[in-house]
Curated annotation (Swiss-Prot):
Presence of the UniProt keyword Cell membrane in the record: no
InterPro entries, per database record: Ribosomal_uL16, Ribosomal_uL16_bact-type, Ribosomal_uL16_CS, Ribosomal_uL16_dom, Ribosomal_uL16_sf
PROSITE patterns: RIBOSOMAL_L16_1 (PS00586), RIBOSOMAL_L16_2 (PS00701)
Protein name per Swiss-Prot or TrEMBL: Large ribosomal subunit protein uL16
Biased composition (Basic residues): 1-20
GO BP terms: translation
Subunit structure: Part of the 50S ribosomal subunit.
Residue span of region Disordered: 1-22
An example molecular function term from Gene Ontology annotations: rRNA binding
PANTHER family, per the entry: 50S/60S RIBOSOMAL PROTEIN L16, LARGE RIBOSOMAL SUBUNIT PROTEIN UL16M
Keywords annotated in UniProt: Ribonucleoprotein, Ribosomal protein, RNA-binding, rRNA-binding, tRNA-binding
Tree of life domain: Bacteria
Length: 139
């Protein structure tokens, strides 16, 4: 599970979910990638589920890159608690993903298997996604 080792502040404000991604919008490491089309909070468990879905489908011979990291805590108050008495305790770690962000990248020799692996991973994520391929002119 991806969580930060230590943080300066245990609790943070909720991040905003508006606007487009400022960086990380193109495939940089692999040949194929999953790009977000809608904004969402992605938890550390969802990132891990997507990674497992990809790696199990490609078995061996491919490489996976994860370009997002859950560095924001989300808090929750216990059930049946009255209002007030402070902010709840941290429950999840999330990555705030904006539209256009390439979250996962994959390098695999067979395009059909690579696309199927990315499709399986996209089903584990809480937003609409599309599969993008590295352009010929990109680094």
């Amino acid at each position: 599970m991806l969580i930060p080792r230590r943080v300066k502040h245990r609790k943070q404000h909720h991040p905003k979910r508006r606007g487009m991604a400022k960086g990380g919008t193109q495939v940089a490491f692999g040949e194929y990638g999953i790009q977000a089309l809608t904004p969402a909070y992605v938890t550390n468990r969802q990132i891990e589920a997507a990674r497992i879905a990809m790696t199990r489908h490609i078995k061996r011979g491919g490489k996976v890159w994860i370009n997002i990291y859950p560095d924001r805590p989300l808090t929750k108050k216990p059930a049946e608690t009255r209002m007030g008495s402070g902010k709840g305790s941290p429950e999840w770690w999330i990555a705030n993903v904006h539209p256009g962000r390439v979250m996962f990248e994959l390098s695999y020799p067979n395009e059909k298997i690579a696309r199927e692996a990315l499709t399986r991973a996209a089903h584990k994520l809480p937003m609409k996604c599309r599969i993008v391929k590295r352009e010929a002119g990109e680094a």
